[in-house]
């Protein structure tokens, strides 16, 4: 079987059973019509091909297609046994309905819902983002939840990035993620970040 050709890793830091996932994962930003529009059928065919090749780790985020990526994953994964795959998404942004001219990522995301991103790394922001993701994904839990884009690349300067990192801790966004893990609606937390220095800082903090 092709599945046996993909290496698996076991992650069990807290000795609670852990997560077993393929080293090769599926990053689903393109499912959000990144840089070009694709049809639902093409998105589903791509996901089916990845599944047939043995991929069992699927990563998404509210930002990807302003929710479209999560919705497309919902349509695909609803026919799969939840025990057969690992799913991750991210927090740090709320996607708010808006007029077409105010939409986030014009020229980057094509044919997506009219929504604009609002950065929110607070406790309430994390909880709201997570609930919206559950709804779009059609699931009751997510295996891995990442805090998204606490970095200079996204926020434009070290000062702005540091302010967002402070918000994440001071306004209890980090506590929200720990709370979700304690409630067993997520199994692991991490960072989806573009710079290693921030990853190291978060790990040491």
List each language-model region with its residue ranges.
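Glycine/proline-rich, positively charged
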Residues: 109-205
């Amino acid at each position: 079987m092709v599945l046996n050709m993909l290496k698996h890793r076991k992650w069990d830091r807290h000795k609670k059973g852990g997560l077993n996932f393929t080293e090769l994962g599926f990053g689903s930003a393109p499912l959000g019509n990144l840089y070009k529009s694709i049809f639902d059928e093409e998105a589903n065919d791509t996901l089916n091909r990845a599944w047939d090749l043995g991929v069992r780790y699927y990563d998404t985020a509210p930002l990807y297609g302003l929710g479209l990526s999560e919705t497309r994953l919902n349509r695909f994964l609803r026919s799969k046994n939840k025990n057969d795959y690992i799913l991750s998404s991210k927090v740090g942004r709320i996607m708010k309905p808006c007029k077409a001219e105010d939409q986030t990522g014009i020229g980057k995301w094509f044919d997506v819902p009219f929504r604009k991103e609002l950065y929110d790394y607070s406790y309430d922001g994390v909880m709201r983002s997570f609930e919206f993701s559950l709804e779009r994904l059609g699931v009751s839990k997510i295996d891995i939840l990442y805090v998204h884009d606490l970095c200079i690349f996204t926020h434009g300067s070290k000062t702005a990035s540091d302010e967002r990192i402070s918000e994440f801790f001071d306004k209890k966004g980090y506590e929200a993620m720990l709370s979700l893990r304690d409630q067993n609606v997520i199994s692991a937390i991490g960072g989806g970040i573009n710079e290693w220095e921030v990853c190291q800082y978060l790990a040491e903090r």
